[in-house]
């Protein structure tokens, strides 16, 4: 790879770096060299991740070389001094002085942190493309993602999995964890390849070794460790994962939300119901202790790590805490009441929770959780969730040392709200009348108390989290994102010394981006999404007409971002009622961002698939949602983004009110904090900047940015937009009449299509790859290029695969191999699949059991996209003139294609795979080939060798075969012959065997043998 000297360090970059990349890498290296901190902004699409990795690892590699030279020098001096009878320790002292600060003695390590594991996976894929791929790396994940023990994985919720895992490890009953010591040096695990979460799980399954604990074995020797934010910023998580930060380089990527993350990591909440359940749980354990037949009660039989006296004392403290919470006065029953930070210490002090006994009580609570995890396997006991809530409260509240209480009082507030409780019977009802320590105490109905409360301990100073980070003696902290500006308020809030800062311009030319403020719609109605105007029918109609007119011009993908889910739903309802929705969906199939994580991945894959159609697709989402924060809509996936309004936080939200009040109270000329109103405006604009960043993703990308709110003309709003966007708006941004904008927009895309290099068709797995629920009717395509589909992921799929592998696949299927000139215009393929031959039903398990569809011309069905996407009923007649989905029963779904019959012959080639049965074969006309073993590669090859109509038929037949009986196998065989029957394609026909149901393989072999002999 080309080598560039940047800030005196040789950096190997995949190609000659652009100027913005050189500037970025220079700032990174200066931070590392000087041991200082940096805040660096570089727009999305400028190769920020690649620049971060190459510059930091180049500096590390240089330091490693220097360290090796110094150690050799030390050894030589030791030998010389010993030869002359001198002391060897003097050489060590001299060398330590020459190397400067004590924390410079060793070679620093890099911690690369980002918000999500899918972002970390993308970063690791970037690392694989560099000259530094051989450097040692590891990624840290949660048990939820890495655990392969079946008993742990069947637990619901991450906290239950954590405690079940701890229990099995403590009891030495997890065979996977016990193998870590013997398998941790296995070549498959210690090999040179970079392993992400998915790779760790696969290696762990192959070696029958715990990936979670095995990954920790790599941390001490890793040059770079990838982890999510919470592992880094949460002191408890750092301790649990044994993360050593001294002399470490900390890179916080996607740091535009770092203030909120720091505040949330220092905040905590407890409810009256949590305390009441903790009392019940302690009571249950005490009953087990005192029961005469406790050995037969189904409870755990091993010796306890606590005594009845411990339980008695804890219950007394909990009862006092419950009493103290009940005594808190809430003057405003709707919005709640705010108290100073000292109130939380007074509240806990009444129950004797103090700095002195906090650690002891937390240790006891952890033991009780472990105890209940065992007991819950034999009875209906809860699993100690209330103890975990109390433990979190104590850990957060007492993490702030007594000597900084003045700062705590300035930065924290206690906000008390009324808790809505449900009338439920207390657990252990048969003994509810008991008194004394086995009873519920004086307040026996506390679970259903009408005055149950929520105690919030909120932090409003993100500097707390960053200060804890800096106190660990890190070498450098580098914050970077595409949307950090304005930098001064960010630096002021985080309260860290920053020596290097950067606001990079974008790498694209002016001609590649069209940015306009649209202040009025086609009907000249003002477009302004403020609180007063949001219910205005004229505004909603005008906004819809604006989107409709833009959708007629924008090719391929169109993104529309709303300020909130309620606003999105309100517009959809209005457009549905007026008929505008039908007009919109006739131009482009419309996808709505789902709130649920399970539906999100499948929706994204369906959108990417719909982009392949000539009409493209429209995705409507919300600012601050999953789509706006982390996904890539490069090239055809996103040619324009419409921002329908400014996503201000809820004005009357107690947390927003208190944050604004905190800033106003603590703002001085010296600290340069924002005013409350400035923060409020900036919070909205940063969300807009993130949404805008979804579109222009690389050097040769192009697109339009349309700001459909008249308030974007305000100078205060414009100044908070990213620097590269401001450059397109000019010195005095003004909204333009709608007519000229339409003409300019049409001309922009016409010119771009003529002058810009157009990307090749993306390689995307067909819709039949989507994971679907088996037990619910779902939405599946009838394989018409004009249809749009929605499906939900299946509950039977491994959760890691659902949450991590599929999320990464949705993003990576859309990503571009950025910054490699030869590949710039080619879309990236899907991630490499395992080379192991897939299980037969693994292929078919991704096909849906029922086929239903959406008619986008029928506005009554819009709620399918809007909420849970329940399947519609099939009572509409179908017309050929409109784009719609058909409701098709699984038995009628696949019909023999014209020109085929059940009497057709079948083609085959022999295979050497162990799964195949050998057949006598005639000499082939074409050289024998082997079908790809990977399911994804197999489908891509089929798609590449047959026309689109046959591939759709192929998909329909596979779907029907998955859900149907033996008759569907007959239909599938006819279809396979039609699609893959040509002599040169018979290797693919033979490769289909591994994906058939076991009961059909023998018949398949007989027919292939018969064909080959004919």
Curated annotation (Swiss-Prot):
CDD domains: DEAHc_FancJ (cd17970), HN_RTEL1 (cd13932), SF2_C_XPD (cd18788)
Location in or out of the cell: Nucleus
KW Flavoprotein (keyword) present: no
Motif interval(s): DEAH box: 253-256
GO biological process, one term: DNA repair
Sites where the protein binds [4Fe-4S] cluster: 147, 165, 174, 210
Disordered as annotated region, ranges: 891-917
Binding site for ATP: 42-49
MF (Gene Ontology): 4 iron, 4 sulfur cluster binding; ATP binding; ATP hydrolysis activity; chromatin binding; DNA binding; DNA helicase activity; DNA polymerase binding; metal ion binding
Pfam families referenced in this protein's UniProt entry, alphabetically: ARCH_RTEL1, DEAD_2, Helicase_C_2
Principal location: nucleus
Keywords: 4Fe-4S, ATP-binding, DNA damage, DNA repair, DNA-binding, Helicase, Hydrolase, Iron, Iron-sulfur, Isomerase, Metal-binding, Nucleotide-binding, Nucleus, Phosphoprotein
Role played: A probable ATP-dependent DNA helicase implicated in DNA repair and the maintenance of genomic stability. Acts as an anti-recombinase to counteract toxic recombination and limit crossover during meiosis. Regulates meiotic recombination and crossover homeostasis by physically dissociating strand invasion events and thereby promotes noncrossover repair by meiotic synthesis dependent strand annealing (SDSA) as well as disassembly of D loop recombination intermediates.
Protein name stated in the entry: Regulator of telomere elongation helicase 1 homolog
């Amino acid at each position: 790879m080309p080598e560039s000297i940047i800030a005196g360090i040789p950096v190997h970059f995949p190609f000659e770096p652009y100027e913005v990349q050189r500037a970025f890498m220079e700032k990174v290296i200066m931070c590392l060299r000087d041991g200082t901190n940096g805040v660096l902004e570089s727009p999305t699409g400028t190769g920020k991740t690649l620049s971060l990795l190459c510059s930091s690892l180049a500096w590390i590699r240089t330091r490693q070389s220097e360290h090796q030279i110094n150690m050799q020098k030390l050894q030589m001096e030791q030998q010389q001094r010993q030869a002359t009878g001198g002391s060897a320790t003097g050489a060590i002292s001299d060398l330590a002085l020459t190397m400067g600060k004590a924390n410079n003695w060793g070679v620093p390590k890099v911690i690369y942190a980002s918000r999500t594991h899918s972002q970390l996976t993308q970063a690791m894929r970037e690392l694989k493309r560099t000259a530094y791929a051989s450097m040692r790396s590891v990624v840290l994940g949660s048990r939820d993602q890495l655990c392969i023990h079946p008993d742990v994985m069947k637990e619901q919720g991450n906290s239950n999995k954590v405690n079940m895992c701890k229990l099995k490890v403590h009891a030495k009953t997890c065979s996977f964890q016990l193998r870590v010591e013997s398998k941790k040096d296995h070549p498959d695990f210690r090999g040179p390849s970079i392993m992400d979460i998915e790779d760790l799980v696969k290696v762990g399954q192959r070696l029958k070794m715990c990936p979670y604990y095995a990954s920790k074995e790599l941390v001490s020797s890793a040059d770079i460790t990838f982890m999510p934010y919470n592992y880094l910023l949460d002191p408890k998580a750092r301790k649990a994962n044994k993360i050593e930060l001294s002399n470490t380089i900390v890179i916080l990527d996607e740091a535009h939300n770092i203030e909120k993350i720091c505040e949330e990591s220092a905040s905590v909440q407890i409810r009256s119901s949590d305390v009441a359940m903790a009392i019940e749980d302690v009571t249950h354990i005490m009953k087990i202790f005192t029961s005469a037949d406790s050995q037969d009660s189904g409870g755990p039989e091993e010796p306890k790590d606590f005594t009845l006296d411990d339980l008695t004392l804890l219950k007394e403290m909990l009862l006092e805490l419950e009493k103290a919470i009940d005594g808190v006065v809430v003057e405003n029953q709707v919005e709640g009441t705010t108290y100073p930070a000292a109130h939380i210490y007074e509240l806990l002090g009444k129950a004797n929770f103090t700095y002195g006994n906090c650690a002891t009580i937390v240790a006891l609570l952890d033991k009780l959780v472990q105890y209940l995890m065992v007991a819950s396997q034999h009875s209906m006991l809860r699993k100690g969730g209330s103890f975990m809530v109390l433990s979190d409260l104590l850990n957060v509240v007492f993490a702030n040392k007594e000597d900084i209480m003045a700062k705590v009082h300035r930065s924290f507030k206690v906000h008390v709200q009324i808790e809505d409780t449900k009338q439920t019977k207390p657990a252990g009802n048969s003994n509810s009348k008991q008194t004394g320590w086995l009873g519920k105490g004086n307040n026996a109905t506390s679970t259903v108390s009408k005055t149950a409360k929520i105690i919030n301990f909120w932090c409003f100073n993100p500097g707390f989290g960053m200060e804890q980070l800096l106190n660990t003696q890190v070498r450098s902290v580098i914050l970077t994102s595409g949307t950090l500006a304005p930098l001064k308020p960010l630096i002021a809030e985080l309260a860290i010394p920053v020596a290097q800062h950067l606001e990079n311009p974008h790498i694209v030319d002016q001609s590649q981006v069209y940015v306009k403020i649209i202040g009025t719609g086609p009907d000249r109605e003002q477009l302004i999404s403020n609180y007063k105007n949001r219910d205005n029918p004229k505004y909603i109609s005008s906004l819809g007409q604006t989107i409709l007119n833009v959708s007629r011009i924008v090719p391929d993908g169109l993104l529309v971002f709303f300020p909130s889910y309620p606003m999105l739903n309100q517009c959809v309802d209005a457009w549905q009622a007026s008929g505008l929705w039908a007009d919109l969906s006739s131009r482009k199939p419309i996808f709505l961002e789902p709130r649920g994580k399970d539906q999100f991945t499948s929706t994204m894959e369906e959108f990417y698939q719909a982009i392949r159609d000539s009409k493209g697709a429209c995705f409507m989402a919300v600012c601050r949602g999953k789509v706006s924060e982390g996904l890539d809509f490069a090239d055809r996936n996103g040619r324009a983004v419409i921002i329908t309004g400014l996503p201000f936080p809820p004005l009357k939200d107690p947390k927003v009110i208190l944050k604004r009040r905190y800033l106003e109270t603590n703002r001085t000329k010296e600290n340069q904090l924002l005013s409350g109103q400035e923060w409020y405006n900036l919070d909205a604009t940063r969300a807009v900047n993130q949404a805008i960043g979804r579109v222009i993703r690389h050097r040769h990308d192009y697109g339009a940015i349309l700001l459909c709110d008249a308030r974007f003309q305000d100078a205060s709003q414009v100044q908070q937009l990213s620097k590269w966007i401001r450059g397109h708006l000019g010195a005095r941004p003004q909204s333009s009449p709608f007519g000229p904008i339409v003409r300019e927009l049409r001309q922009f895309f016409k010119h771009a299509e003529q002058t810009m290099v157009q990307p090749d068709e993306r390689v995307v797995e067909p819709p039949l790859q989507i994971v679907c629920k088996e037990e619910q009717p779902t939405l599946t395509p009838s394989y018409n290029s004009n249809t749009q589909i929605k499906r939900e992921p299946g509950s039977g799929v491994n959760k890691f695969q659902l949450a991590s592998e599929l999320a990464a696949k949705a993003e990576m299927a859309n990503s571009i191999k950025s910054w490699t000139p030869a590949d710039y215009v080619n879309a990236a393929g899907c991630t490499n699949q395992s080379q192991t031959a897939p299980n037969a039903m693994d292929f078919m398990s991704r096909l849906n059991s029922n086929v239903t569809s959406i008619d986008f011309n029928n506005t009554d069905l819009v709620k399918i996209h809007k909420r849970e996407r329940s399947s519609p009923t099939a009572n509409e007649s179908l017309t050929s003139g409109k784009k719609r989905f058909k409701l098709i029963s699984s038995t009628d779904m696949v019909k023999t294609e014209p020109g085929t019959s059940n009497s057709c012959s079948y083609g085959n080639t022999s295979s050497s795979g162990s799964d195949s049965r050998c057949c006598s074969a005639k000499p082939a006309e074409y050289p024998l080939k082997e079908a790809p073993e990977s399911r994804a590669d197999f489908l891509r090859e089929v798609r590449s060798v047959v026309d689109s109509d046959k591939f759709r038929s192929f998909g329909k037949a596979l779907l029907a075969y998955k859900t149907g009986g033996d008759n569907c196998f007959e239909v599938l065989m006819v279809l396979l012959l039609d699609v893959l029957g040509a002599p040169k394609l018979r290797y693919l026909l033979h490769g289909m065997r591994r994906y058939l149901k076991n009961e059909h393989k023998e018949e398949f072999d007989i027919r292939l043998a018969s064909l080959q002999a004919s």
